[in-house]
Regions:
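N-terminal domain-onset segments
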Residues: 1-51, 81-124
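Acidic, low-complexity, intrinsically disordered interaction modules
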Residues: 49-56, 61-85
Length: 124
């Protein structure tokens, strides 16, 4: 699980579009990520790299609303055209089954608790 305190809009944009930085469309999409995250609070960011594929999930709050976006690709292509934040809710996020990705499910649940002001400190 990534620690979001170290995640910036720039680092997310680089994860998604660094391999296309010399391509005009890649530059445009890189800038789209930066614009959509301007003034946002990143709540969850997962970026996974496997042998021949990558996937990413981003949950953020902007102007009091929750947004999420998800992308995946194989080694042949990148995340082109997949950065598409959609408005969501805690109810939607918590009811969803994240098949095969427990880290995202745990990160969403933890972000919900923190966002709700629940004390997540564990004591014996």
């Amino acid at each position: 699980m990534n620690d979001v305190k170290d995640v910036t809009a720039k680092s997310i944009a680089e994860d998604w579009y660094s391999s296309f930085e010399n391509d005009e469309k890649g530059k445009t999409e890189h800038n789209d990520v930066l614009k959509s995250l301007q003034g946002a609070t990143i709540l969850v960011y997962e970026f996974n790299c496997y042998s021949y594929e990558e996937d990413s999930f981003c949950l953020f709050r902007k102007n009091g609303k929750l947004f999420e976006t998800y992308g995946t690709h194989c080694s042949c292509y990148g995340f082109e055209g997949q950065w598409n934040p959609v408005e969501t809710s805690w109810e939607e996020l918590l009811s969803r089954k994240y098949y095969g990705d427990e880290t995202v499910q745990k990160a969403v649940a933890n972000a919900y608790l923190l966002d709700s002001g629940v004390d997540t400190t564990w004591t014996q």
